[in-house]
């Protein structure tokens, strides 16, 4: 007797394994390149610690304050004065010129920024950018203790 052979129907199923491989390769590429993206102002900030930073009394200290309305004030002294601010408001350009002169005269000057908690984030970033243009290598941020 002769056997009757039935034709098999073609399988219409899509193989998704190559797509998963491509997706994983792209994921690895994005994970490697994401930390290399450069965002924001290049300023070398000190690491945050729970203790106050030690003060070097031999170094001059420049304090830049940014009030809630976005106005800039600066004060030069032997220590950071967080209680009183008697200087008059200056523009960002005036502050940059003054800081450039101070840094050229005394390059070891410590620079700190006091930003009001209600101030626009862009005002503090603008101040940090201006300090970078003035040649300040390190900027400290002053906060209140909890």
Curated annotation (Swiss-Prot):
Subcellular location(s) per record: Cell inner membrane
Transmembrane segments: 16-36
Membrane topology listed for this record: Single-pass membrane protein
Main location: membrane
GO biological process: cell division; protein transport
Organism superkingdom: Bacteria
Entry GO terms, CC: plasma membrane
Pfam families in the cross-refs: ExbD
Keywords associated with the record: Cell cycle, Cell division, Cell inner membrane, Cell membrane, Membrane, Transmembrane, Transmembrane helix
Disulphide-bonded residues: none
GO molecular function, one term: transmembrane transporter activity
Family membership: Belongs to the ExbD/TolR family.
Record-linked HAMAP family: TolR
Function: Part of the Tol-Pal system, which plays a role in outer membrane invagination during cell division and is important for maintaining outer membrane integrity.
Quaternary structure and partners: The Tol-Pal system is composed of five core proteins: the inner membrane proteins TolA, TolQ and TolR, the periplasmic protein TolB and the outer membrane protein Pal. They form a network linking the inner and outer membranes and the peptidoglycan layer.
The name this protein goes by in its record: Tol-Pal system protein TolR
Species the sequence originates in: Pseudomonas aeruginosa (strain ATCC 15692 / DSM 22644 / CIP 104116 / JCM 14847 / LMG 12228 / 1C / PRS 101 / PAO1)
Designated gene of the protein: tolR
């Amino acid at each position: 007797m002769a056997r009757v052979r039935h034709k098999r129907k073609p399988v219409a199923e899509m193989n998704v394994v190559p797509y998963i491989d491509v997706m994983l390769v792209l994921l690895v590429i994005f994970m490697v390149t994401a930390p290399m993206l450069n965002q924001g102002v290049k300023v070398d900030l000190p690491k945050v610690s729970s203790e106050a930073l030690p003060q070097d009394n031999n170094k001059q200290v420049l304090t830049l304050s940014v009030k809630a309305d976005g106005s800039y004030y600066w004060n030069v002294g032997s220590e950071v004065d967080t209680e009183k601010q008697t200087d008059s408001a200056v523009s960002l350009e005036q502050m940059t010129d003054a800081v450039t002169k101070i840094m050229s005269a005394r390059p070891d000057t410590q620079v700190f920024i006091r930003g009001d908690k209600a101030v626009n984030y862009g005002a503090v970033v603008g101040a940090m950018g201006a300090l970078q243009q003035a040649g300040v290598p390190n900027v400290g941020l002053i906060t209140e203790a909890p």
